UniProtKB/Swiss-Prot annotation:
GO CC annotation, single: nucleoplasm
GO biological process, one term: negative regulation of non-canonical NF-kappaB signal transduction
Induction: Up-regulated by interferons IFN-alpha and IFN-gamma.
Post-translational events: Phosphorylated. Dephosphorylation correlates with the formation of a complex with NMI.
Free-text note regarding domains: The NID domain 1 is involved in the negative regulation of p65/RELA transcription and the negative regulation of NF-kappa-B pathway activation.
UniProt lineage: Eukaryota, Metazoa, Chordata, Craniata, Vertebrata
Span list, region Leucine-zipper: 5-26
Pfam family, one: IFP_35_N
Gene: IFI35
Protein name: Interferon-induced 35 kDa protein
Species, as recorded: Homo sapiens
Entry keyword set: Cytoplasm, Immunity, Innate immunity, Nucleus, Phosphoprotein, Secreted
Length: 286
């Protein structure tokens, strides 16, 4: 499996916690409409324009969980550069000429340019099953000032008390905007979900929280297609005659010249010979 495909699948897994919450909402909607439940829940993923903003990552390891925006990691080979222009029309003009000659004082650099395409997930199909011993706790205010450990401890104490409808907590996990709690005995999760609303003391304030069923979701099928990145181009086969900073300046000057079809450069990252890089793409709104 290619590295870009691995990166796309990894980004998909990072979104799984958010998708679990959405699966629960979809199931509730079916109940309201009187529809019969189904095991598989296919839905389309909205198209998200991507842009490289100059962030790179040296270590190929990616965090196991992601709290906010979609991120796709694109490997950059040795002797290459990634350029993002302010205007997508400039990128189109640059790509019309597949080989560029960069004039320098003592020599010329001949480099190739090509469009950048990233693998994007277009459709996800997941199987879902309500967990009998786990719940999802939501409603945490952004102003809450507690560390992860403090928050989990306080929730375990509160929902571990039988007078609050709870029981012994044996699993706890912080998710994006929510917390998953697992209980040692049957019936506790169902009882808490029936109550639904709780006021929990957190950080010196009384915080209203919602408890809902936790959905175990597993990706069954993912359709992937290549999507062009309209404002970015790859520069390849850069010879090893300049160091990184000097090469960066030479490329930026060349590709900003209107006479070469260039224009304003928003971000430029160079990977010299003997090195490797990882470009991080986020959504346009990110």
């Amino acid at each position: 499996m290619s590295a870009p495909l691995d990166a796309a699948l990894h980004a998909l897994q990072e979104e799984q916690a958010r998708l679990k919450m959405r699966l629960w909402d979809l199931q509730q909607l079916r109940k309201e409409l009187g529809d019969s439940p189904k095991d598989k829940v296919p839905f389309s993923v909205p198209k998200i324009p991507l842009v490289f903003r100059g962030h790179t990552q040296q270590d190929p390891e990616v965090p196991k969980s992601l709290v906010s925006n979609l991120r796709i990691h694109c490997p950059l080979l040795a002797g290459s550069a990634l350029i993002t222009f302010d205007d997508p029309k400039v990128a189109e003009q640059v790509l019309q000429q597949k080989e560029h000659t960069i004039n320098m004082e003592e020599c010329r650099l001949r480099v190739q340019v090509q469009p950048l395409e990233l693998p994007m997930v277009t459709t996800i199909q997941m199987s879902s099953q309500l967990s009998g011993r786990r719940v999802l706790v939501t409603g945490f205010p952004a102003s809450l000032r507690l560390s992860e450990e403090e928050l989990l401890d306080k929730l375990e104490i509160f929902f571990g008390k039988t007078r609050n409808g709870g029981g012994d907590v044996d699993v706890r996990e912080l998710l994006p905007g929510s917390v998953m709690l697992g209980f040692a005995r049957d019936g506790v999760a169902q009882r808490l979900c029936q109550i639904g609303q709780f006021t929990v003391p957190l950080g010196g304030q009384q915080v209203p929280l919602r408890v809902s069923p936790y959905v175990n979701g597993e990706i069954q099928k993912a359709e992937i297609r290549s999507q062009p990145v309209p404002r970015s181009v790859l520069v390849l086969n850069i010879p090893d005659i300049l160091d990184g900073p000097e090469l960066h300046d030479v490329l930026e000057i060349h590709f900003q010249k209107p006479t070469r079809g260039g224009g304003e450069v928003e971000a430029l990252t160079v990977v010299p010979q003997g090195q490797q890089g990882l470009a991080v793409f986020t959504s346009e709104s990110g």
